Regions:
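Conserved, structured core segments of small domains
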Residues: 1-108
């Protein structure tokens, strides 16, 4: 299954020391894991919208549970707001639309 994953928000930084700590202990390790997931084809595509504090990617997982575990392993998991949308395949949608056409033709 494919999922659209959007992570946004997160803590602001009041002091440079705080920014340094969060960057070193949360942000950079999270990106390291994201790059690893991308290399293992668990993240198919993604990136960061220019000028935003948001991460967007398409993830591949066998189940909702697998994706949940994958996201929870990211150090930034508890720091950001996550929105996950399961994606229907184009092929699956075509089958549904063909069935709808068939049913409508039977009615008419």
């Amino acid at each position: 299954m494919k999922y659209l994953v959007v992570a946004s928000g997160g803590p602001g930084f009041a002091y440079p020391e705080e920014a340094l700590e969060v960057l070193q202990s949360v942000i950079l390790p999270s990106f390291k894991e994201i790059l690893s997931l991308e290399k293992r084809k668990k993240i198919i595509a993604g990136g960061i919208p220019i000028g935003e504090r948001t991460i967007v990617f398409i993830a591949e997982a066998i189940s909702n549970d697998e994706l949940d575990q994958m996201l929870r392993k990211l150090p930034m998991w508890g720091e950001l707001d996550w929105e996950v949308t399961p994606l229907q395949t184009f092929n699956g949608r075509v089958k549904q639309e063909r069935q709808a056409v068939k049913e409508l033709k039977n009615i008419l």
